[in-house]
């Protein structure tokens, strides 16, 4: 049986949005990652602050593997090193967003106005047996 996987829309290209898109794409899901500004803009706003946890706790094994597959010479931070928010963005989040798994599905400078579910033409067409999302 070859069922088509549902398309996943992720709102926000911050750390969680990028990692979520990465895992979904790795599993074969079609993904669109929307960001109203720049990648990890909120982290960049407090980029001067040192993170409370080391890099190893702020990255995933899939993220590290994706970066190494993309560029074997990419210098990853020491897993025990603590960095500023800005360093986290420039050394991990931006390169990850530029990787083959994310780059094609990322849409920056796009503000999401509304979301919904397929098959709902109007409020009266809601089938109570269907899950809401």
Residue ranges and their predicted role:
Residues 4-33:
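N-terminal Rossmann-like FAD-binding beta1-loop-alpha1 element of flavoenzymes
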Residues 17, 40, 52, 115, ...:
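Flexible, glycine-rich phosphate/dinucleotide-binding loops
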Residues 24, 46-49, 121-123:
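Short, glycine/charged-enriched secondary-structure capping and boundary segments
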Residues 32-35, 106-108:
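A structural signal for short, well-ordered beta-strand segments and their strand-loop junctions
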Residues 38-91:
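Glycine-rich active-site loop/strand segments that organize a redox cofactor
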Residues 75-133:
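Feature captures the FAD/FMN-dependent oxidoreductase FAD-binding
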């Amino acid at each position: 049986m070859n069922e088509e996987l549902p398309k996943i829309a992720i709102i926000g290209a911050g750390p969680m949005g990028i990692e979520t898109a990465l895992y979904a794409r790795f599993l074969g899901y079609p993904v669109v990652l929307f960001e109203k500004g720049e990648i990890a803009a909120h982290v960049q706003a407090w980029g001067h602050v040192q993170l409370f946890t080391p890099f190893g706790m702020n990255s995933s094994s899939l993220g590290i593997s994706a970066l190494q597959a993309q560029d074997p010479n990419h210098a990853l931070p020491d897993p025990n090193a603590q960095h500023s928010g800005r360093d986290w963005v420039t050394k991990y989040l931006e390169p990850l967003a530029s990787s083959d798994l994310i780059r094609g599905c990322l849409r920056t400078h796009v503000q999401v106005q509304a979301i919904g579910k397929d098959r709902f033409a109007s409020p009266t067409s809601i089938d109570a047996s269907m899950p809401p999302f």
